[in-house]
Amino acid sequence: MIAIIDYGAGNIFSVKNALDYLGLECKLTSDINEIKAADALILPGVGAFPAAMNMLEKSGLIDTIKEEAAKKPLLGICLGMQMLFEKGYEFEECNGLGLIKGSVRYMDEPDLIIPHMGWNKLEKLNECPLLENIGDNEYVYFVHSYKAECANENI
């Protein structure tokens, strides 16, 4: 079973509908025991980094997520992926989960219109099982104003 972590923020129903469509067993949950029993975890998210981390902290799930991430696959989607990093800098400096070394910062890119929205080619720098069915330079849709800055071993 895949646990979709419900901490009060995020696109949880879109994620659940997608997994249901694919025929995957999944559950929306904020229950620590269900998260521990899951085979894999998904941390969705929409909104601002500090507010989402505050909601995650209030849910009491931070320690459980960190512990379980060491044992099983964890996929962060959108803001959920950003929260996996050590810090975020949206509005203010804010601690993340610290599962990935690095930080999430505003995209100060003079050649891009921010927010960055639209179809762009995905550049794969390393082989990754999550992307094995996606060809090189395929178009994917982006909607973001922030970027992850991390050490090369995390890319």
Question: What spans do the regions from the language model cover?
Answer:
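Generic structural signal for residues in well-ordered beta-strands
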Residues: 26-28, 104
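An anion/phosphate-binding loop that grips the pyrophosphate of nucleotide cofactors and donors
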Residues: 38
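Cysteine-nucleophile active-site neighborhood
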Residues: 47-117
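Structural alpha-helical scaffold elements that stabilize or flank donor/cofactor-binding regions
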Residues: 34-35, 68
